[in-house]
């Protein structure tokens, strides 16, 4: 269901699309990276939290910041319903609750991974010419809570989308193919 559930914020940005499943994968990868860069954090727990934090959206749909001004979602009920009958239901519910409370180091890193996944998408849209992405980027970066995420965000914002494949030292490759 999550691979067919669209992230709805892009409607307001005017460009792009992403499913909740795509977002969760990106968030989990970023969460793993952040956990590896931050000492004393349980990386496996961060990855699980990143993978599970939007599971309720399989029942509720994705509610972006504009929607949340007007609609209240019963995420606890959605989580309880989707986890019902699973032998690991308590773990799923606990990880989602911990993510939402944002009190543990793992929850803070997971929340920052969630924001960095959006930041990466916004940076791509900016580099491709979206006129609204800059304002979104400024607001998104303000949500980051950990120093490791803030450092990564700074590096992302200073790097062009094509920099990884279009390096100056590889300029001859683009001409000669070698």
State the predicted function of each range:
Residues 1-178:
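Alpha-helical, largely C-terminal catalytic domains
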